[in-house]
């Protein structure tokens, strides 16, 4: 792993959060806090997990470091190398693909000028291909940071990226106005009866 810092320690605020997370688990089961602690370490370290951060988490939990590495390398939510300010994760799993994720991938490639696994020269965007993000009913979709952008087409995907490029904050959720995961055409079965009840 290149570009690794020599040390890692949680800052004071995150050290308190780490203690609170560990305290949620019964004595003898503190290792169960490994995933939230890795997330906390990643957030403190600009979106990626250096080896020293994983070693620090292992020390806090009394785990062999290899067990922490196994978790960090298994889940795609952990980044083992530096990423851009905006991590664009495009779902290409079957439901998104059937609903047009190829067009979303193409729009992202065109707008950002990069491909999967790459970061823009200015360090603003990293683009990743990801497996299912769990919002299949609103496919196709992508995740940027902690936000989901759903019911995408190439135009809406491009608009989201352009807004981020200009420093704006695009509205997460459905890009077609759909309410949560209702059918695309609106409610069909659970409609209010006449009289509003």
For the regions a language model picked out, list residue spans one by one.
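Signature of N-terminal electron-transfer/Fe-S-associated modules in redox systems
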Residues: 1-197
